[in-house]
Amino acid sequence: MNDVTEASLPKAIFLMGPTASGKTALAIALRKVLPVELISVDSALIYRGMDIGTAKPDAAELSAAPHRLLDILDPAEAYSAADFRRDALAAMADIVAAGRIPLLVGGTMLYFKALLEGLSPLPSADPEVRARIEQQAAEQGWNALHQQLQEIDPVAAARIHPNDPQRLSRALEVFFISGKTLTELTQTSGDALPYQVHQFAIAPASRELLHQRIEQRFHQMLASGFEAEVRALFARGDLHTDMPSIRCVGYRQMWSYLNGEIPYDEMVYRGVCATRQLAKRQVTWLRGWEGVHWLDSEQPEQALNKVLQVVGASQN
């Protein structure tokens, strides 16, 4: 897209970052000085009744800066990157129509990627094809299926471990349904985002500081009633660990504790470790992200000024 065309597009701001990096505080500060409306980009914050363990903005924060795509689903419901893209595009169009700028804030990098680049036209899952693959795996073993994938799609086979049956099965299923490899189809992305996007990533300067923040926040969550929050979900009887909501970091560890699988101290240790691993994955995504401006979460005023400078410069 050339500069002239891009300059004529409506503006949007992405504020990305790992968990516990200060995204919400910066987003609220930005709303005070820019004509922005916030859209949450977080696969955990979409769920109702999951407030403490997701560090959902509190009532005061939401009053200062309302977020869209927050509390839109029951924890029993699933939500895909395609669902997010559809809902985010509708919210963005609504915000622009009101003469304001969409500010998308969160840490679900897959959602940002889907929004920015569009989605690959992959076929929907087919239970019959999946059952056939699983039967073949039961008879021959997953290693044999991995060798089969290597012949069909060597690029995907190099990326997928033989001990990852879910992804291995999906790669074969895509080929059997469409006649095209996963690699071919993922290279054909959908529609690019029709906005002039300014992208920012906020994080502490050191990994140690981020780890420290994560541990402090996990203990704050426990002190704020996280166990009671998960007990209420556990008591419903219709939720389980195969659901995306209960697989969220912190929730799945607390679920194991409530299920009698691990002691309390082990739950705390695993919860902190899982959150750190999530943050590491988020930072890895961002390190490879093109066109992103980095912000130091320990310098909030400097971070705010940098966003204003970049967004303001595009108006000149």
Curated annotation (Swiss-Prot):
> Which residues are involved in binding substrate?
T19, A20, S21, G22, K23, T24
Question: Which reaction is this enzyme known to catalyze?
Answer: adenosine(37) in tRNA + dimethylallyl diphosphate = N(6)-dimethylallyladenosine(37) in tRNA + diphosphate
Enumerate the cofactors the protein uses: Mg(2+)
Family designation: Belongs to the IPP transferase family.
Query: A Gene Ontology molecular-function term?
Result: ATP binding
Which InterPro entries does the UniProt record give?
Answer: Dimethylallyltransferase, IPT, P-loop_NTPase
List, in alphabetical order, the GO biological process terms annotated in this UniProt record: tRNA modification
Q: Which EC numbers characterise this protein's activity in its record?
A: 2.5.1.75
Which EC class is the enzyme in? transferase
Q: Which UniProt keywords apply?
A: ATP-binding, Magnesium, Nucleotide-binding, Transferase, tRNA processing
Which Gene3D superfamilies does this UniProt record tie to the protein?
Answer: 1.10.20.140, Crystal structure of tRNA isopentenylpyrophosphate transferase (bh2366) domain (1.10.287.890), P-loop containing nucleotide triphosphate hydrolases (3.40.50.300)
Residues covered by region (Interaction with substrate tRNA): 42-45, 166-170, 247-252
Q: Which organism is it from?
A: Klebsiella pneumoniae subsp. pneumoniae (strain ATCC 700721 / MGH 78578)
Query: Where ATP is bound, by residue?
Result: G17, P18, T19, A20, S21, G22, K23, T24
* Protein name listed in UniProt: tRNA dimethylallyltransferase
NCBIfam families in the cross-refs: miaA
Instruction: Report any Pfam family annotated for this entry.
Output: IPPT
What is the role of the protein in this entry? Answer: Catalyzes the transfer of a dimethylallyl group onto the adenine at position 37 in tRNAs that read codons beginning with uridine, leading to the formation of N6-(dimethylallyl)adenosine (i(6)A).
Under the subunit heading, UniProt states: Monomer.
Matches recorded under PANTHER family: TRNA DIMETHYLALLYLTRANSFERASE (PTHR11088:SF60)
Q: Where is this site: Interaction with substrate tRNA?
A: T108, R130
